[in-house]
From Swiss-Prot:
It comes from Oryctolagus cuniculus. Glycans are attached at residues 82, 180, 372. The active site is at 148 (proton donor). Keywords: Cell adhesion, Cell membrane, Disulfide bond, Glycoprotein, Glycosidase, GPI-anchor, Hydrolase, Lipoprotein, Membrane, Signal. InterPro entries: Aldolase_TIM, Glycoside_hydrolase_SF, Hyaluronidase, Hyaluronidase_PH20/Hyal5. This is Hyaluronidase PH-20. It is a lipid-anchor; GPI-anchor. Testis. Belongs to the glycosyl hydrolase 56 family. Gene3D superfamilies: Aldolase class I. PANTHER family: HYALURONIDASE, HYALURONIDASE PH-20. Residues 1-35 form the signal peptide.
Length: 545
């Protein structure tokens, strides 16, 4: 970390701050200098966090012969090719225009093989027809383009995608045999990236033109390629600077997108990895997506809908545990994403037995947890933001979650298949929200964060109809004894004990720090507080090394 110099005109000398003292000093004195941390407004009114279901389970029946309980989900869409007019439409390579690629299994050339040889104008003509077919009405929904065969950034096409680099270089050499390999490679890179950009950019433009009420974006964008579960002692899941730079270079893509669809799928390596390893990977990937969402306009960020699965990608019959849900869904909610898309393959509904397993998992594990985080997030939004923004971690790296206090709440599944929430929040619960979370205002709203929780008298939030917390705020904690040990609250009681060893990052650009300090200490009526804090730092030897 570089030197932070603060020269106070009244002190007549320069003081250098560092380490813990610098962080404490900044957090105490410069909240007014921070740029407002905005989030995209809800896609659906009164649904601050969107749950979406993107799995082919429409024919599944549960134990009682009834369809799966999807009451917590606001948008639905089956990936099956014959499904149209859905809340979520996912476009694979075989159902959206003439996407050029090489079949990874057979090596067959499809629509020109590489983007430079792809029929762009024919693609757009076909694209128009298929958009109108799959989206007969322009209702509010998600339009997700899943093109994974090649990436628009040349250097990200590593094995086995390096075939696109190889074929691009071969094309240039066939057209210009006089070029040496180095020059041919450089030209191939330029040609490939331009053609890839044209295909992806023009596809988004036409989609937005024809169906403007849908939110358009590409699955897996952005990504930061932090997949190293097997090195928890060496690797903290951070996104490498080079990958952040490459994401920055895709500004044209973020400009044309109206939503981002990153992914936090876990493999079985994550199952055997430490809790922190899984947590780091998900946390950093979502944090990078939120950073990218602000590239087009930091005051009007793009919504982030994070794709997740209920199973491990390479063990499709093994559901995620309670703790895995905390490390995925819990992280996503606490970081302030716009929603989650649960994707699933046909294996979820391949037989009556698999449908029954899914039904049981949803009733006993998934849905109670979704209710828990939904109610906690809505409660925080209501008391902290007056519902004009969403609660996000004050610093993105600590292990603070939007969970109901397990000592005060219990979520019960009744014999009739409906859920009931027992308990009430206390002043201490609300103060914990205020301590660990901040209010990120919705775009174009100048919301004010409540700081005194003593003024909150009641809380009225619902996860779904008749699954609500509608009560007054209790003055002190009263331990609630759940009737059933399957209550989700007690399972969460240990999740906040995880200690993160990652370095805390300042939630604002360092270049603005010294200017903010100068302005505050010039105009603050508490100048001697500034002086005393600086003096304390000097006394205790907090100098930069």
């Amino acid at each position: 970390m570089g030197v932070l110099k603060f020269k106070h005109i009244f002190f007549g000398s320069a003081v250098e701050l560092s380490g813990v003292f610098q962080i404490v000093f900044i957090f105490l004195l410069i909240p007014c200098c921070l740029t407002a941390n905005f989030r995209a407004p809800p896609v659906i009114p009164n649904v601050p966090f969107l749950w979406a279901w993107n799995a082919p389970t429409e024919f599944c029946l549960g134990k009682s012969g009834e369809p799966l309980d999807m009451s917590l989900f606001s948008l639905f869409g089956s990936p099956r090719k014959n499904k149209t007019g859905q809340g979520i439409t996912i476009f694979y390579v075989d159902r959206l225009g003439y996407y050029p690629y090489i079949d990874p299994h057979t090596g067959a050339i499809v629509h020109g093989r590489i983007p430079q040889l792809g029929p762009l104008q024919q693609h757009l003509t076909k694209l128009r027809q298929e958009i109108l077919y799959y989206m007969p009405k322009d209702n509010v929904g998600l339009a997700v383009i899943d093109w994974e065969e090649w990436l628009p950034t040349w250097l990200r096409n590593w094995k086995p995608k390096d075939i696109y680099r190889i074929k691009s270089i071969e094309l240039v050499k066939s057209q210009h045999p006089q070029y040496n390999h180095s020059y041919a490679t450089e030209k191939a890179k330029r040609d490939f990236e331009k053609a890839g950009k044209d295909f992806m950019e023009e596809t988004l433009k036409l989609g937005r033109l024809l169906r403007p009420n849908h939110l358009w974006g590409y699955y897996l964008f952005p990504d930061c390629y932090n997949h190293h579960y097997d090195k928890p002692n060496l690797y903290k899941g951070s996104c490498f600077d080079i990958e952040k730079k490459r994401n920055d270079d895709l500004s044209w893509l973020w400009k044309e997108s109206t939503a981002l669809f990153p992914s936090v799928y876990l493999t079985s390596r994550a199952r055997s990895a430490t809790a922190l390893s899984k947590l780091y990977v998900v946390r950093n990937r979502v944090h990078e997506a939120i950073r990218v969402s602000k590239i087009p306009d930091d005051k009007s960020p793009l919504p982030n809908f994070v794709y997740t699965r209920l199973v491990f990608t390479d063990q499709i019959f093994q559901f995620l545990s309670h703790h895995d849900l905390v490390y995925t869904i819990g992280e996503i909610v606490a970081l302030g994403a716009s929603g989650i898309v649960v994707w699933g393959s046909q294996s979820l509904a391949r037989s009556m037995k698999s449908c029954l397993h899914l039904d049981n998992y949803m009733k006993t594990i998934l849905n109670p947890y979704l209710i828990n985080v939904t109610l906690a997030a809505k409660m925080c939004n209501q008391v902290l933001c007056q519902e004009q923004g969403v609660c996000t971690r004050k610093n993105w790296n600590p292990n603070d979650y939007l969970h109901l206090n397990p000592g005060n709440f219990a979520i019960q599944l009744g014999s009739n298949g409906t859920y009931k929430v027992d308990g009430k929040p206390t002043l201490t619960d609300l103060e914990q929200f205020s301590k660990n979370f901040q209010c990120s205002c919705y775009t174009n709203l100048n919301c004010k964060e409540r700081t005194d929780m003593n003024n909150v008298r009641t809380v009225n939030v619902c996860a779904v109809e008749n699954v609500c917390i509608d009560t007054n705020v209790g003055p002190q904690a009263v331990t609630y004894a759940p009737k059933e040990k399957k209550d989700v609250a007690h399972i969460l009681s240990n999740t906040t004990s995880i200690n993160s060893s990652t370095t805390m990052s300042l939630p604002f650009p360092r270049k603005h720090v010294s200017g903010c300090l100068l302005v505050l200490c010039m105009y603050s009526q508490y100048l001697n507080i500034c002086y005393r804090l600086v003096a304390i730092g000097i006394q205790h030897g907090y100098y930069l090394k």
